[in-house]
């Protein structure tokens, strides 16, 4: 079977790595990923030029295309590939609105009475935002309606001082058509612990993966700018230390109800559904959906797959997805980034990656925003690579990952607290306080 992975980051490297032993592997990427280029035939080009991607797939007799990033999904890459006879792991443009149009997602919850929603309003002018916030006596979250690479959301009490600043940021979002819409969503701020559940979907059935928790803040202690994610962990048993089986099951039910609603409102959803939840005193609440794997969370779950990913892909396109099995391990992912990220890029600087020692430690490296030139790896400004380790406990996996992070030399930084016992316990205690 010939499988094409579309995308160039660490998420796509993890997807390719999970497929490499069972398929003839191809990749279409905007820049050469040093890890993917070793294991796949590839073409370099803009992943958003969907006709060119489809031509590459047809020319190489691709059986299944696996779409990594959100931007091509929003442009209709799946529709274009399927028009050319290529089956896809990824939703159609219409179904991908679950991520690309947050107002569509919230309205879906409203229209189909799906549990786990929250107070929200969509606005297209500043005066209405101002009037609403004058009467709203709780902190809020301000979100552009469309895609902003995970960096457009601002929270009162974190990035914004008060609801007055929320008004000003809302005006900026509308005036600049941030995310491609002249609209803004205002949501109530939830108090709790965030967690992620990702699931394989075949249009009808949903096979959930182990839960994970991301760490979006740039610096240790959960401070600094919100990034695409500085690392994440998952636990043995598929839950998290603060997440019960009942809460996990409730979140999965919300995702199943969403899957049914998308099929009625748009088209059957095939691919990966990523649910970002907040565990609150009232149970799990849906923060947002992504129409693809999370980055970094893909790196937690894909190395734990027991069922071959190639078999899962075939089941998704055939519509007969059943239970997907994972090895019962914990995992920790730590992102290596340019020192001072996200304000400083160190673009063009060389880093050294001792892949052999990382492998000998039992960890994996997944490359992201780096370039390869004359066998040297260069930073290109954003998150550089993910280091992932698994173990019988989060503590064991974290220690391996931390040792492996020392195998990267250069002007780089990582959050050494991701997955540590102290930080995990802080999450557990926070949840206990909320529930009591």
From Swiss-Prot:
InterPro entries: ATP-grasp, ATP_grasp_subdomain_1, PreATP-grasp_dom_sf, PRibGlycinamid_synth_ATP-grasp, PRibGlycinamide_synth, PRibGlycinamide_synth_C-dom, PRibGlycinamide_synth_C_sf, PRibGlycinamide_synth_CS. Pathway: Purine metabolism; IMP biosynthesis via de novo pathway; N(1)-(5-phospho-D-ribosyl)glycinamide from 5-phospho-alpha-D-ribose 1-diphosphate: step 2/2. Mn(2+) 2 binds at residues 288, 290. GO terms for biological process: 'de novo' IMP biosynthetic process; purine nucleobase biosynthetic process. It comes from the Archaea. Mg(2+) 2 binds at residues 288, 290. Mg(2+) 1 binds at residues 276, 288. Binds 2 magnesium or manganese ions per subunit. It is an enzyme of class 6 (ligase). It holds the Pfam family GARS_N. Keywords: ATP-binding, Ligase, Magnesium, Manganese, Metal-binding, Nucleotide-binding, Purine biosynthesis. It catalyses: 5-phospho-beta-D-ribosylamine + glycine + ATP = N(1)-(5-phospho-beta-D-ribosyl)glycinamide + ADP + phosphate + H(+). Gene3D superfamilies: 3.40.50.20, ATP-grasp fold, A domain (3.30.1490.20), ATP-grasp fold, B domain (3.30.470.20), Phosphoribosylglycinamide synthetase, C-terminal domain (3.90.600.10). GO terms for molecular function: ATP binding; metal ion binding; phosphoribosylamine-glycine ligase activity. Residues 106-318 form the ATP-grasp domain. Its EC number is 6.3.4.13. ATP binds at residues 133-196. Mn(2+) 1 binds at residues 276, 288. Its cofactor is Mg(2+); Mn(2+). Belongs to the GARS family. NCBIfam families: purD. HAMAP family: GARS (MF_00138). This is Phosphoribosylamine--glycine ligase. The gene is purD.
């Amino acid at each position: 079977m010939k499988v094409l992975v579309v995308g160039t980051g660490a998420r796509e490297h993890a997807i390719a790595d999970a497929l490499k032993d069972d398929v003839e592997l191809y990749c279409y990427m905007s820049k050469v990923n040093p890890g993917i280029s070793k294991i796949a035939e590839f073409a370099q080009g803009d992943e958003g030029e969907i006709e060119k991607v489809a031509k590459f797939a047809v020319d190489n007799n691709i059986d299944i295309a696996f779409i990594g990033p959100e931007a091509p999904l929003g442009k209709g890459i799946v529709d274009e590939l399927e028009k050319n006879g290529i089956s896809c792991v990824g939703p159609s443009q219409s179904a991908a609105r679950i991520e690309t149009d947050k107002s569509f997602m919230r309205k879906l919850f409203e229209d189909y009475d799906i549990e786990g929603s929250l107070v929200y309003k969509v606005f297209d002018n500043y005066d209405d935002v101002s009037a609403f916030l004058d009467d709203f006596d709780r902190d809020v979250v301000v979100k552009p309606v469309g895609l902003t690479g995970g960096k457009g959301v601002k929270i009162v009490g974190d990035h914004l001082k008060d609801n007055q600043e929320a008004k000003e940021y809302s005006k900026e979002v509308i005036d600049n058509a941030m995310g491609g819409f002249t609209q803004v969503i205002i949501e109530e701020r939830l108090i709790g612990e965030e967690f992620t559940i990702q699931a394989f979907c075949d249009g009808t059935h949903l096979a959930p993966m182990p839960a994970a928790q991301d760490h979006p803040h740039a610096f240790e202690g959960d401070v600094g700018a919100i990034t695409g994610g500085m690392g994440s962990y998952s636990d043995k048993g598929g839950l998290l230390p603060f997440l019960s089986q009942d809460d996990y099951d409730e979140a999965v039910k919300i995702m199943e109800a969403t899957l049914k609603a998308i099929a009625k409102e748009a088209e059957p959803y095939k691919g990966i559904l990523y649910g970002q939840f907040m565990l609150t005193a009232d149970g799990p609440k849906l923060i947002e959906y992504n129409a693809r794997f999370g980055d970094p969370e893909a790196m937690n779950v894909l190395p734990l797959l027991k069922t071959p990913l190639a078999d899962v892909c075939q089941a998704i396109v055939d519509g007969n997805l059943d239970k997907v099995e994972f090895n019962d391990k914990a995992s920790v992912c730590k992102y290596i980034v340019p020192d001072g990220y996200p304000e400083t890029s160190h673009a063009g600087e060389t880093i050294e990656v001792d892949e052999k020692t990382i492998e000998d430690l039992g960890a994996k490296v997944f490359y992201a925003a780096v370039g390869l030139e004359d066998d040297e790896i260069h930073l290109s400004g954003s998150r550089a690579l993910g280091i992932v380790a698994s173990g019988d406990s989060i503590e064991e996996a974290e220690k391996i990952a931390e040792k492996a992070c020392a195998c990267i030399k250069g002007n780089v930084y990582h959050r050494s607290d991701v997955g540590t016992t102290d930080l995990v316990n802080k999450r557990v205690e926070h949840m206990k306080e909320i529930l009591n």
